[in-house]
């Protein structure tokens, strides 16, 4: 490799350092929304951690398939206009783009307004997500503050605090209570 090639590679690494890579909707083959979605003003005061409660994924192909299946289910069976969460975290340690943070989510009923929905792909009732997934979520939260998607002093909540659900599962719920910005109250 020439010195110019090394310089370009080095500059690229510097440009992306500190930002969690996000798998875009186009990359996981999302459908477009099938209806209007209410907007929200960002930065948001809350981040809500959930789990999808279904199967987990550990590689790019399987995680993308889970994203497509979840979107199909939420749009056809739950009658949402799009996938309900803003971001999802795969067991491969990657963050998947859901709906825009400036659009109201569809995961917490009346508490969707003002909440950034982040769901881990899988069921985390008995076991926690792996380190790669947990690290990706923590980096995503930091990045969301830097990008003015969340206010600096946002409240971190578990899905069960804003909805009648077991989500994000006992194992994951116990972990997020130790994270920065954790809040007992909305």
Curated annotation (Swiss-Prot):
Subcellular location: Secreted
Residues glycosylated per entry: 181
Claim: Ribonucleoprotein is one of the keywords in the record: no
Pfam family, one: Amidase_2
UniProt keywords, alphabetically: Disulfide bond, Glycoprotein, Immunity, Innate immunity, Secreted, Signal
Record has Secreted as a keyword: yes
Induction: Strongly up-regulated by PGN from B.subtilis. Weakly or not expressed in normal conditions. Regulated by the imd/Relish pathway.
One Gene Ontology term, aspect cellular component: extracellular space
Domain N-acetylmuramoyl-L-alanine amidase: from-to ranges: 47-169
S-S pairs: 57-63
Effect after changing residue 68 to R: In strain: DI7, Draveil, Loua, Monty5, Tahiti, Texas, S30 and ZW141
GO MF term (any one): zinc ion binding
One annotated GO biological process: positive regulation of peptidoglycan recognition protein signaling pathway
Superkingdom as given in the UniProt entry: Eukaryota
Secretion signal span: 1-18
Effect of residue 183 to F: In strain: Loua, Monty5, P. bourg, Tahiti, Texas and S30
Family matches, as CDD domains: PGRP
Tissue specificity statement from the Swiss-Prot or TrEMBL entry: In larvae, it is mainly expressed in fat body. Also expressed in uninduced hemocytes and mbn-2 cells.
Job description of the protein: Peptidoglycan-recognition protein that plays a key role in innate immunity by binding to peptidoglycans (PGN) of Gram-positive bacteria and activating the Toll pathway. Has no activity against on Gram-negative bacteria and fungi. Shows some partial redundancy with PRPGP-SA in Gram-positive bacteria recognition. May act by activating the proteolytic cleavage of Spatzle and the subsequent activation of Toll pathway. Recognizes S.aureus PGN.
Family per record: Belongs to the N-acetylmuramoyl-L-alanine amidase 2 family.
Name of the protein: Peptidoglycan-recognition protein SD
Organism of origin: Drosophila melanogaster
Gene designation per UniProt: PGRP-SD
